[in-house]
Amino acid sequence: MKKLFAALALAAVVAPVWAATQTVTLSVPGMTCSTCPITVKKAISKVEGVSKIDVTFETREAVVTFDDAKTSVQKLTKATGDAGYPSSVKQ
């Protein structure tokens, strides 16, 4: 029983290490007014695993930090597209 508890405790400590935080810059060319970033940010914020969002109208970009164990770039671009603002990863 002690070995099982020790193994579970170790797994609980190590599990967060497996998940990696990633930051991606999305190009969102469809933002045409200063209120568009609000809609884009709201759409991205609904995606599970997103921890930080910075949307800038002037550059028409969204910089998103997320947990890649909970979401993916594809889910982020789908969220912006579903909100009416198609996006792609900026190279």
Curated annotation (Swiss-Prot):
GO CC terms of this entry: periplasmic space
Q: Which Pfam families does its entry note? A: HMA
Mention one GO molecular function. mercury ion binding
Keyword Signal assigned to the entry: answer is yes
Asked whether the keyword Transferase is assigned, the reply is no
User: Which keywords, in A-to-Z order, does the entry hold?
Assistant: Mercuric resistance, Mercury, Metal-binding, Periplasm, Plasmid, Signal
Annotated family: Belongs to the MerP family.
NCBIfam families, alphabetized: MerP
The protein's name is Mercuric transport protein periplasmic component
Q: What species does this protein belong to?
A: Alcaligenes sp
